[in-house]
Amino acid sequence: MGQKTNPIGFRLGVTKNWRSTWYAKKEMPALLKEDALLRKYLKARLDNAAIADVTIERKPGKVVVTVHTGRPGVVIGKKGAEVDKLRDELAQLTGKEVGINVEEIKRPEVEAQLVADNIAAQLSQRISFRRAMKRAVQSAMRMGALGIKVKAGGRLGGAEIARVEGYMEGRVPLHTLRADINYATSTAKTTYGTIGVKVWIFKGEIVEDRRGKTYSTGN
């Protein structure tokens, strides 16, 4: 049932990698909690930096955090001042040495998390949900996505009865494991309650070259 499972979890270990790359035995629950705390803190602290994902790698006595952002200048700051400040804050939070890498997202229009957050932000500002979704779909297709599906659920437009509305363009093959599907969710807080936003973006197929390296045909 490709439509009903999380497309990222469905492809983990096949075409997708884990967001946390480390191994632990007894301390695993504490480290998982620490990972969740780091992500929550970064999301709140860099609210205006278009954060798509945070990957965490652990080495003995050190945590390496990679921030995937559409606006690297906001994260790094003038002469790297912001990133140094952030490194100190995270070191204080974890009690360990922290390294921060910043990776720029070249095409934010085809990054599911940024698209979902953008739609949610527009819904919070009372912009028509149809206009917000259509605009996101058109931008993604224009920037090279092979397919996109967007859904919003809740009291859309302040309606008495909650419902789900969606738009789709191109193809989004959820059953195909080699399909490079980017999936994300976001929540819009409105005066009528919360509205959930889901975005699926099909970027191409993951194929292997003669050297055994994998790449997406959509890049």
Curated annotation (Swiss-Prot):
Instruction: Name the lineage.
Output: Bacteria, Pseudomonadati, Gemmatimonadota, Gemmatimonadia, Gemmatimonadales
GO MF, one term, reads:
rRNA binding
Q: Does the keyword Ribonucleoprotein apply?
A: yes
Q: Which residues form the KH type-2 domain?
A: 38-106
- Gene Ontology cellular component list: cytosolic small ribosomal subunit
Source species, please? Gemmatimonas aurantiaca (strain DSM 14586 / JCM 11422 / NBRC 100505 / T-27)
Q: What's the domain of life for this entry?
A: Bacteria
| Quaternary structure, from the entry | Part of the 30S ribosomal subunit. Forms a tight complex with proteins S10 and S14.
In the UniProt record, does the keyword Amino-acid biosynthesis occur?
no
> What's the protein here called?
Small ribosomal subunit protein uS3
Please name the gene that encodes this protein.
Answer: rpsC
